[in-house]
């Protein structure tokens, strides 16, 4: 525990020293110097709210800790991720998030993409019970047509404050005209006191849910620009599905931005860095300027403080200048 506490003290001092500073783009910059211990340790992370739950505008994503990094054709990366993110490293990362004002993480309920080794629930329980961790958990769930509630119930039983339907499931059910299944899943989530959401990679999902008047608390929709070298050219993008090379998750950013300007529900944008292909300064700015209320970002421990500072500075600037879509508080 001493190692974590020493890091906690360092983070408090360095965050105080960083107040008012803006980081240049990228994660590969040197750490800011630690300031005097007597300085204020408060980090003013912008906050929002989804129904009754207060949530930091930057949310810690969960793909990295299960080894799901969308590594394209780099076959060693998933194993590297799983070896890096030991239980203690996950705990350390969440603790750093709390130090930096990030009060919420998103993580799966026994993800089928975790190679049978999803640590999320086990480590979250350890973090809360053994370390006194207070980070909130919004659970990514995997309802099935023959079992809508089992995965959701596991999230409820393990202390989640919210739950949403996995994006691939949301895409598939809307494509197959099963909005009714999504509505039933949301109803079960809300009945148990959690905030309910739907994730998706296709803008057709929130369009269909809004048209049907489905009672959902928030949307999780991908948003990133196509200004990176491995993005699929527009002429080659499928009309409805994602490109086949695991390299792009928002094929219609302009349409997504335009649609959400007319949506009054909170929007958590994810894949805002195109799974590591876009610099944080650029990706965060694109997401928040274009209407996202929250950003879900997978982070290594050494990226947390940089991303927190970038988020704070970009949102402060946007709130001074304004943006076309109002913030959903």
Language model features with spans:
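Active-site-adjacent beta->alpha loops and helix N-cap segments on the catalytic face
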Residues: 113-127, 147-148, 171-185, 253-254, ...
